[in-house]
Amino acid sequence: MLKHIDLYTDGSCLGNPGPGGYGAVLVYGDHRKEISGGFRLTTNNRMELMAAIMGLRTLNAACQVRLTTDSQYVRQGITQWIIGWKKKGWMTSNRQPVKNVDLWKELDAEVARHQIEWLWVKGHSGHPENERCDELARDAASGKELAEDTGYQP
């Protein structure tokens, strides 16, 4: 039987592009873990993706995950758009390369390990876990030791 995990994610970018960060909160029963990270130059969408990737990557074994995000880009991308992108060799319906393809491939690999229910919550609407993820992401984006987002392409 798979463990049931609640995973909340958010990304933030100060400028877009600019310094960015991600935050994730994982809840398993009475256990809670918060993770975050920041990058010198990135975009909001990349940080939204990174939050989901890093949250899922934290799980050591296959789990039943209820992932809540305020990003329709992430939720629709992974549940709908990715099917066509993969069929078309990671091209959009307009025959353009998929943006953030490096992170979409990483997310696709992480998703394959788990059973995931994707939920959307309106950002900045007072949802406690989403607000906490936003705080983690903003704090990470404002940090002094920011990593390089090697996949970012202007």
Swiss-Prot record:
Record's subcellular location: Cytoplasm
GO cellular component, one term: cytoplasm
Main localisation: cytoplasm
Reaction equation(s) it catalyzes: Endonucleolytic cleavage to 5'-phosphomonoester
Cystine crosslinks: none
Matching Gene3D superfamilies: Ribonuclease H-like superfamily/Ribonuclease H
Pfam families: RNase_H
Domain of life: Bacteria
Positions of the RNase H type-1 domain: 1-142
Gene Ontology MF terms: magnesium ion binding; nucleic acid binding; RNA-DNA hybrid ribonuclease activity
Positions of the UniProt region annotated as Disordered: 126-154
Bias kind Basic and acidic residues: ranges: 126-147
Binding site for Mg(2+) 1: D10, E48, D70
UniProt similarity note: Belongs to the RNase H family.
Job of this protein: Endonuclease that specifically degrades the RNA of RNA-DNA hybrids.
Protein name, entry field: Ribonuclease H
Organism of provenance: Aeromonas salmonicida (strain A449)
